[in-house]
A protein has these predicted regions:
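Extended ligand-binding regions for polar small-molecule ligands
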Residues: 87-96, 155, 168, 173-175, ...
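Acidic, polar ligand-binding/catalytic clefts
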Residues: 91, 95, 100-163, 229, ...
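Ligand-binding clefts/hinges and TM-proximal coupling segments of bilobed small-molecule sensing domains
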Residues: 49-54, 176-193, 226-234, 259-279
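A ligand-binding cleft/hinge motif common to bilobed small-molecule-binding domains
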Residues: 127-135, 180-182, 204, 209-237
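Extracytoplasmic small-molecule ligand-binding "clamshell" domains
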Residues: 49-126
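Periplasmic-binding protein-like
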Residues: 68, 144-152, 215, 219-260, ...
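Short helix-initiation/N-cap motifs at beta->coil->alpha
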Residues: 87-88, 102-114, 156, 173-176, ...
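Bacterial lipoprotein signal-peptidase II cleavage site
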Residues: 17-34
Length: 279
């Protein structure tokens, strides 16, 4: 503003000393100065509004740790590629953030620890928010809902969760299914496997009486294994979220912003519908 005032005073002095022919030149100088200051001010404002670049494990990439044996959320194709709800959601988030998605496949427990210890940026593997997990990592807004289901042989006498008392229960190691079952039925009755498929194979072989796992993969496993069924009564209901290292608010805020956009424009629902048929 001081520059503009000085220029106006200068213009007034020039008008008093010169003929009318000097007026156009003075107006041009004044207009140029105002435009210059406005552009400078706009540049400063834009710089202040621009978000800081995200710091990730690998520059330019969003590294996701997962356990790719959890269909339809994460799985491996015949060609060795990763696909599934979580994979597609993570890819859409990465695109929103201007990053390239990198998927690291490992055991479920290791996937959680990778995000917790900053070895990966995020963990997505049908991860449920629990009080214990909140102590060691932060979570995004919910992006999907899950149900813990019980798989049994078609001729089983197990009709509900109440009938699991004293039975051998197969679960996936480190999952909420494992946590819930050990809390409800004791560790001696719960057998943890590296993935859901191995637990279902144990059920087929008569090594366990039932398997407790998320409903979406449960449906996939039952469809692929004639002679098994899912009980009508759900064991537990829960929400899935994206885990990040404790205190990484910059990344968490960016992820939540991307999720909000994906929900608003219908992308998130389209991804879910791609893998899970609406009933």
């Amino acid at each position: 503003m001081k520059k503009i005032t000085a220029l106006m005073l200068s213009s007034a002095m020039m008008l008093s000393l010169a003929a009318c022919g000097g007026s156009a030149s003075t107006d041009a100088v004044s207009s140029e100065a105002v435009s210059s200051e406005a552009a400078s001010s706009e540049a400063v404002s834009t710089a202040e509004a621009a978000p800081a670049a995200l710091t990730t494990v690998t520059a330019g990439k969003l590294t996701m740790s997962t356990n790719a044996a959890f269909p339809p959320y994460e799985m491996t194709t015949d060609s060795g590629e990763f696909e599934g709800i979580d994979i597609d959601v993570a890819a859409a988030i990465a695109e929103k953030l201007g990053l390239e998605l990198q998927v690291d496949d490992m055991d479920f427990d290791a996937a959680l620890l990778a995000a917790q210890n900053g070895k990966s940026d995020i963990v997505m593997a049908g991860v449920t928010v629990t009080d214990e997990r909140l102590k060691v990592m932060d979570f995004s807004d919910t992006y999907a809902e899950g149900i813990q289901s019980i798989i049994v042989p078609e001729d089983s006498d197990i009709a509900s969760a109440d009938d699991l008392t004293g039975k051998a229960i197969g679960t996936q190691r480190g999952t909420t299914g494992y946590i819930y079952c050990t809390d409800d039925f004791g560790e001696d009755n719960v057998i943890a496997y590296d993935d859901g498929l191995t637990a279902v194979q144990a059920l087929n072989n008569g090594q366990v009486d039932a398997v407790v796992i998320d409903n979406a993969p449960a449906q996939e496993f039952v469809e692929a294994n004639p002679g098994l069924k899912i009980l009508d009564t759900a064991y537990a209901q829960e929400d899935y979220a994206i885990g990040v290292a404790k205190g990484n608010t910059q990344l968490l805020d960016a992820i939540n912003g991307a999720l909000e956009e994906l929900k608003a424009d219908g992308t998130l629902q389209a991804i879910v519908d791609k893998y899970i048929n609406a009933e």
